[in-house]
Amino acid sequence: MAKRVTGPEIEKLIQLLAKVPGLGPRSARRAALHLIKKKDQLLGPLSNAMGEAYDKVKICSRCGNVDTVDPCTVCTDTQRDQSVIIVVEDVSDLWALERAGAMNAAYHVLGGTLSPLDGIGPDDLNIRGLIDRVGEGGIRELIIAVNATVEGQTTAHYITDQLQGLDVKITRLAHGVPVGGELDYLDEGTLAAALRARTVI
């Protein structure tokens, strides 16, 4: 059995860092050591920033984005075409599409995809909010930009079925997005091309 070489506070820091996506136990130890070595330049400011984020971050009641205001900056941006909504699975997808800079539209974050095997149904996602937004009127196009997975395609078809009879054009990203690919990992050029080549469902 390995002996403990640090105090419980450092062990707790490592354990929490290891829960961050992309960081395993080894990477978490390296990150923790780096933060500790740069205590004044990194650890202190990071601690303060995390405290502020914990106190101030909100989920937008309109679109599901994360921001420090509700409704969020995207929803209140008068320079955006609010008649076009890009539907994404997660906030990271919203950020990826914004980095691509191909469209200046509104967004709607579902919070995942339908997955009966995992027990995730329509009521577990932000689908009702989307249907309500479209039902209010003023939306001319809905771009479904979910990942090209079985769950993503199932979700896209479910949303399309729920919006039958409403006067809204429903499109999806073109097949430039690889099957099984996730938007957050695609480069900006691929995302921009996929948005421009979207097709009607």
From Swiss-Prot:
Pfam families the UniProt entry points to: RecR_C, RecR_HhH, RecR_ZnF, Toprim_4
ZnF (C4-type) residues: 60-75
Residue ranges that the Swiss-Prot or TrEMBL entry lists as coiled coil: none
GO biological process, one term: DNA recombination
Keywords on record: DNA damage, DNA recombination, DNA repair, Metal-binding, Zinc, Zinc-finger
SMART domains cross-referenced by the UniProt entry: TOPRIM
InterPro entries per UniProt: DNA_Rcmb_RecR, Rcmb_RecR, Rcmb_RecR_Znf, TOPRIM_dom, TOPRIM_RecR
CDD domains per record: TOPRIM_recR
Segments crossing the lipid bilayer: none
Gene3D superfamilies for the chain: 3.40.1360.10, 6.10.250.240, RecR Domain 1 (1.10.8.420)
Ranges for domain Toprim: 83-178
MF-aspect GO terms: DNA binding; zinc ion binding
HAMAP family in the record: RecR
NCBIfam families recorded: recR (TIGR00615)
General function of this protein: May play a role in DNA repair. It seems to be involved in an RecBC-independent recombinational process of DNA repair. It may act with RecF and RecO.
Family under the similarity heading: Belongs to the RecR family.
Name by which UniProt lists this protein: Recombination protein RecR
Organism (species): Rhizobium etli (strain ATCC 51251 / DSM 11541 / JCM 21823 / NBRC 15573 / CFN 42)
